[in-house]
Swiss-Prot record:
Monomer. GO terms for biological process: beta-lactam antibiotic catabolic process; response to antibiotic. Changing I117F: Significant increase in ampicillin resistance. 2-fold and 3-fold increase in catalytic efficiency with ampicillin and nitrocefin as substrate, respectively, mainly due to an increase in substrate affinity. This is Beta-lactamase. The keyword Transferase does not apply. The record marks I117 as: Functions as a gatekeeper residue that regulates substrate accessibility to the enzyme active site. Its EC number is 3.5.2.6.
Length: 307
């Protein structure tokens, strides 16, 4: 990653991405048949329960209702650890709080600031990184140090975590909360409400950020582009949808077998849906292995309904 300013080219590319994934959705939204409805929830719930048994896991799923489809819900209002899914609304909070020129601000840091899973930040200790580069690293590579530096930049009287939670409250999310930075936020024991959200809450936040007006078009385009080029989600929601669906996402992984993914997906005709899939395997203890295949199979169930 070169240390250079956030230029017009990057913004134009991001705007092009936003048009490509949403333009056909606007065109198609009025053409969807009124008969497009979801099947009875019991059948899907049984399939999700079977996945829980097979993977020895707890699964949470939420797909918000659209004008012609009912919501898909399974443990949608149970709390799950954020893990790195918080980085998508974190970047949105930074974009919301500042003008686009803020993306060129250089942030310097030392080796003492490097945290686990920081593949990008650890390469730039000598040069520092711009806010724009930190946003890119936090979303596309789930870089923990980048996220902590963005939290510090977000600032506020109670610190970055309080400012982040406050941003969620401004979007109407009264459930989610962030209490710690990376990597501690991934380590809270089962049943602890710190650093948690629900599939329902995070899905509605993502809906506002990508499909709503929580961000102006230019900033929304940047967030959409970074999520579209995410490098960590190939085996999760993306794996569960057919190749002709467009998917943008942000993953999260943590202790106690936690594996999450939040996404916006577009059908081949351009119809958008928000999909949140969260999981943990607390019964396996602190070192339980996250199961990406569980998320992929849950996404396949969702895709089968939406298709």
């Amino acid at each position: 990653m070169r240390n250079r300013g956030f230029g017009r080219r990057e913004l134009l590319v991001a705007m092009a991405m936003l048009v490509s994934v949403t333009g056909c959705a606007r065109h198609a939204s009025g053409a969807r048949p009124a008969s497009t409805t979801l099947p009875a929830g019991a059948d899907l719930a049984d399939r999700f329960a079977e996945l829980e048994r097979r993977y020895d896991a707890r699964l949470g799923v939420y797909v918000p209702a659209t004008g012609t489809t009912a919501a898909i819900e399974y443990r949608a209002d149970e709390r799950f650890a954020f893990c790195s899914t918080f980085k998508a609304p974190l970047v949105a909070a930074v974009l919301h709080q500042n003008p686009l020129t803020h993306l060129d601000k250089l942030i310097t840091y030392t080796s003492d600031d490097i945290r686990s899973i920081s593949p990008v930040a650890q390469q730039h200790v000598q040069t520092g990184m711009t806010i724009g580069q930190l946003c890119d690293a936090a979303i596309r590579y789930s870089d923990g140090t980048a996220a902590n530096l963005l939290l510090a930049d977000l600032g506020g009287p109670g610190g970055g975590t309080a400012a982040f939670t406050g941003y969620l409250r401004s979007l109407g999310d009264t459930v989610s909360r962030l209490d710690a930075e990376e990597p501690e936020l991934n380590r809270d024991p089962p049943g602890d409400e710190r650093d948690t959200t629900t599939p329902h809450a995070i899905a509605l936040v993502l809906q506002q950020l990508v499909l709503g007006n929580a961000l102006p078009p230019d900033k929304r385009a940047l967030l959409t582009d970074w999520m579209a080029r995410n490098t960590t989600g190939a085996k999760r929601i993306r794996a569960g949808f057919p190749a002709d669906w467009k998917v943008i996402d942000k993953t999260g992984t943590g202790d106690y077998g936690r594996a999450n993914d939040i996404a916006v997906v577009w059908s081949p005709t351009g119809v958008p849906y928000v999909v949140a899939v969260m999981s943990d395997r607390a019964g396996g203890g602190y070192d339980a292995e996250p199961r990406e295949a569980l998320l992929a199979e849950a996404a396949t169930c969702v895709a089968g309904v939406l298709a």
